[in-house]
A protein has these predicted regions:
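Hydrophobic alpha-helical segments, chiefly the membrane-spanning helices
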Residues: 1-330
Length: 330
């Protein structure tokens, strides 16, 4: 029991430090390349912080533990919105830019609906997994192409000399890659220790997947989102959550199902966990709408904001959800 406890403590310390450096690197690369921090938050940060979910779910599928794989993916989505965005908003209200409301959040809602439809038969087969991966490739490709077209349409030209004074690409790449590597390694150590402790206490696989593993593999999102919000990089914090949930719903489940088709899983995943995930995704859109919010962007459009009250609401939902899971398991 001592070794798992040490892994949890060291993993958490390294996780917090590496997340801060990872955000610095991501923002630096985004600015150097002229990309928006929203896009790099969805693609690079979203992928990097979802790497633990991918590894855990793939291994779970190969070890014939579909409940752990699905619990990890969908539990992480629930934790990302209710716990991580909730905590981030309580610490520092999160700005929701117009692009996220018009394009990215509707896509996330559509992807969530697709995941529910594919799971209605109580199985996620290899074809379902391939469909999810193809949709994932399409969504990421569309976002990247849209960003490139928008840059050209606006006639935006980056002054490389001025940009290099503001940020060093080499240094940013170093922090980005080093931070990413340490994020993955520390989260793996943290999850391993937490799972070892939980199993020593006799907790079920599904409960582990939905709670400890889901929260553990979502800690990179928590650390990087808080770090981004405290640095004033709201696009990165919000894009991180959207990107991570897209990765989890499409890539994580898709990879797991393609490697080892899930012929069956507990009915509670479909009747309890996926509806909670869907409701939270819709609330994310509703809370982000710029209704009665006076912030204006450079284009004269109102900006949405997830404030501390809404963040507290998310946290309350998560506490209630976890309490319900524990009550059912007892």
């Amino acid at each position: 029991m001592l070794l798992p406890i040490i892994a949890v403590v060291i993993g958490l310390v390294v996780l917090v430090w590496s997340a801060d450096k990872f955000v610095d690197g991501a923002v630096g690369v985004a600015r150097f390349c002229g990309m928006s921090t929203l896009l790099i938050g969805m693609v690079i940060v979203g992928f990097g912080t979802s790497a633990p979910e991918m590894v855990v779910s793939a291994i779970s599928a190969m070890q014939d533990a579909p409940e752990l794989a699905l619990g990890n993916a969908y539990g992480s989505n629930i934790a990302n919105i209710a716990l991580i965005l909730g905590v981030t908003a309580v610490i520092s209200p999160v700005i929701v830019v117009r692009k996220a409301l018009k394009r990215d959040l509707p896509v996330l809602i559509a992807v969530t609906v697709l995941a529910v439809i594919l799971a209605l038969d109580g199985a996620i087969g290899r074809i379902d997994g391939i469909v999810l991966l193809l949709v994932f490739a399409g969504v990421m490709g569309f976002n990247i192409i849209s960003e490139i077209r928008q840059k050209h349409k606006a006639g935006h030209v980056e002054d490389s000399e001025e940009s290099s004074k503001e940020v060093s690409l080499g240094k940013s790449l170093l922090w980005l890659l080093l931070g990413l590597a340490l994020l993955v390694a520390s989260s793996r150590a943290l999850v391993w220790g937490a799972v070892a402790i939980a199993r020593a206490l006799g907790v079920s696989d599904l409960l582990i997947g939905l709670t400890i593993v889901a929260v553990g593999t979502s800690l990179p999102e928590l650390a990087s989102s808080i770090a981004a919000a405290r640095k004033g990089e709201d696009d990165l914090a919000f894009g991180n959550i959207i990107g991570s949930n897209l990765f989890n719903t499409l890539a994580v489940v898709g990879i797991a199902a393609t490697i080892a088709p899930m012929d069956s899983f507990e009915a509670s995943v479909l009747s309890r966990d996926m509806p909670v995930m869907a409701v939270l995704t819709i609330l994310l859109l509703l809370f982000g709408l710029p209704v009665r919010k006076k912030r204006i962007d450079a284009g004269g459009h109102r900006i949405g904001r997830i404030n501390r009250i809404e963040g507290t609401t998310f946290l309350a939902i998560y506490v209630g959800y976890i309490a319900f899971l524990i009550a059912q398991a007892m």
